[in-house]
Curated annotation (Swiss-Prot):
Catalyzes the reduction of the double bond of an array of alpha,beta-unsaturated aldehydes and ketones. It also reduces the nitro group of nitroester and nitroaromatic compounds. It could have a role in detoxification processes. FMN binds at residues 23-26, 60, 102, 215, 307-308. It is an enzyme of class 1 (oxidoreductase). This is NADPH dehydrogenase. It comes from Bacillus cereus (strain Q1). It comes from the Bacteria. The gene is namA.
Length: 345
């Protein structure tokens, strides 16, 4: 029997062998605080590739040093960082998967000794530092940094780029009226709040012709914040600019209580897919093969982003295949150990 979860998926000239994506998750493991890939990262990402994930996405990787969430985040702000990232893509490719990278700037959520930057001088909460409102010069420099990061991503061998526009980081801060109180061309109307992301996409398109994803927070969980319907319009603009897929997460723009349950964010992937007519990725408490297969069969999303479940077991695709009764092609090195992997957590 054929299963959609294990069917190929092609975006532009990149074909994924299945619909399982390793969701980008910060590991805070650049131990020398220099943004460099370490041996841990090579093992971490390489193992998920060997575990038969279709697309392995490297964690949020800072386009500028001051754009890191922590001082142990990965970076792509300098050419000296390309070699390490290329080792990671080689590990991933050699183990049968495609490689993606999430380009990011933490904005006001950067927990560093340096000043935090944001569209407006509003802290995330009472315990975090007051950010500095970005000047137009700083905005232009950041747009350029995303473009340069895209060039380095290509040189490092990545197949896919994802722009991190979610979880209350810099791009998300520009998009949301809760965090963007500017009175210039980067604030006010939805068109103006989208301008920063528009310029980033434009700049990346000048140097990158591969698949381009954007991760969004499709719900601010605040009465004065953005909802999924607001993101339909944002997504239509992204699609016009050539974005290929929207990775639909939610929250973390402002402190909020979120009702979390299995597949709680799938509704956003479905809504964006239906109303903006674009491919989407579903993410958030998707933990079984049957659940993932149902999402795809219901046409609620095109790709399944798996996060913590892949931290629990890097061989999640094998477990999902066993659960569904699908015979997954194994790495030849493991063929001497056929049979089921335990699904015990």
């Amino acid at each position: 029997m054929n299963y959609k979860l294990f069917s190929p998926y092609t975006i532009k000239d990149v074909t994924l062998k299945n619909r399982i994506v390793m969701s980008p998750m910060c590991m805070y493991s650049s131990k020398n605080e220099d943004g460099q890939i370490t041996n841990f990262h090579l093992i971490h990402y390489g193992t998920r590739a060997a575990g038969q994930v279709g697309l392995v996405m490297i964690e949020a990787t800072a386009v500028l040093p001051e754009g890191r969430i922590s001082n142990k985040d990965l970076g792509i702000w300098d050419d000296s960082l390309i070699e390490g990232l290329h080792k990671a893509t080689t590990f991933i490719h050699d183990n049968g998967a495609k490689a993606a990278i999430q380009l990011a700037h933490a904005g006001r959520k950067a927990e560093l000794e340096t000043d935090a930057l944001a569209p407006s001088a509003i802290p995330f909460n009472e315990t975090m530092k007051m950010p500095i409102e970005m000047s137009k010069h700083q905005i232009k420099d950041t747009v350029l940094a995303f473009q340069q990061a895209a060039v380095r991503s290509k040189q490092a061998g990545f197949d896919v780029i994802e722009i991190h526009g979610a979880h209350g980081y810099l791009i998300n801060e520009f998009l949301s009226p809760l965090t963007n109180k500017r009175t210039d061309e980067y604030g006010g109307s939805p068109e103006n709040r989208y301008r920063f992301l528009r310029e980033i996409i434009e700049s990346i398109n000048e140097v990158w012709n591969g698949p381009l994803f954007v991760r969004i927070s499709a719900n601010d969980y605040h009465p004065d914040g953005l909802t999924v319907q607001d993101y339909v319009q944002y997504t239509k603009w992204m699609k016009e600019q050539g974005v290929d897929l929207i990775d639909c997460s939610s929250g973390a723009v402002v402190p909020a209580r979120i009702d979390v349950y299995p597949g709680y964010q799938v509704q956003y992937a479905k809504h964006i897919k239906e109303h903006a007519n674009i491919a989407t990725g579903a993410v958030g408490l998707i933990t079984t093969g049957a659940q993932a297969e149902q999402i795809l069969n219901n046409n609620e999303a095109d790709l399944i982003f798996i996060g913590r479940e892949l931290l629990r077991n890097p061989y999640f695709p094998r477990i999902a295949a066993n659960e569904l009764g699908f015979e997954l092609e194994e790495p030849y090195q493991y063929e001497r150990a056929p049979g089921k992997i335990s699904t015990n957590k």
